[in-house]
Amino acid sequence: MGQKIHPTGFRLAVSRNWASRWYANNNNFAAMLQEDIGVREYLKKKLKNASVGRVVIERPAKNARITIFSSRPGVVIGKKGEDIELLKTELQRRMGVPVHVNIEEIRKPETDAQLIADSITQQLERRIMFRRAMKRAMQNAMRLGAQGIKIMSAGRLNGIEIARTEWYREGRVPLHTLRADIDYATSEAKTTYGIIGVKVWVYKGDTLGRNDAPVVEEVAEDKRPRRNARPGDRRPRRDGEGGAPGARRGAPRRGAGKPEDGKTGE
């Protein structure tokens, strides 16, 4: 099932965190969720050229904190911070509460799944061959530290009449392993022949918990080596196995005692 389920939803509360971090009762949940969806669609359209990887929305105490992860933070902020002030004003109007906007820079955009998918779709819209775009993205990701990447494109590739699906993979992408840090994203290319869908999986290594800490194997208490133990040491004796080291354990073999009268051993 790891091949079918959404990789992010499969790992929520295990190795991934939610993109919307707030709590609401049953009466307000639907309205707040609809607000989040509208904000994400607005930011995706407004910051189309800013290389936005993901958006995290938090709602602490009748406020809203929106964190935008972008590889081009200068485009989001604008000249002297003008663009971000206009953005903040529009978000406050949409959400109805004071909004704080934070910008986080993505250091390695070549290994971010959303940015890879968006880059491929932009190339497809410019009529670049899909194989060339996919292989170039895979090479850049592996060169900058990704342990594995898989890219899938589906639709009327190169304008053919019958739609098909093609995918390429490099490295390893363990979708069943919960501790594996799998970054997954999708994007759509709107071409003259129709829509081409792009899916990207990027394996960045194993994590422990939601803080992206490295996995450290703990040694169990009963498996810890003894302080002065050596490889050639004897195993501990069981009860009833005392005696000298050369003593024979257990009952003597039958006929192994004194020879009977009139018989001598040969």
Swiss-Prot record:
A GO molecular-function descriptor: rRNA binding
The keyword Protease is annotated on this UniProt entry: no
Annotated family: Belongs to the universal ribosomal protein uS3 family.
Record field: compositional bias (Basic and acidic residues): 230-241, 257-266
Statement: the UniProt record of this protein carries the keyword Ribosomal protein: yes
Annotated protein name in UniProt: Small ribosomal subunit protein uS3
InterPro entries linked: KH_dom, KH_dom-like_a/b, KH_dom_type_2, KH_sf_prok-type, Ribosomal_S3_C_sf, Ribosomal_uS3_bac-typ, Ribosomal_uS3_C, Ribosomal_uS3_CS
Residue ranges of the region described as Disordered: 218-266
Species of the source: Burkholderia multivorans (strain ATCC 17616 / 249)
Gene3D superfamilies found in the cross-reference section: 3.30.300.20, Ribosomal protein S3, C-terminal domain
A Pfam family of this chain: KH_2
GO cellular component, one term: cytosolic small ribosomal subunit
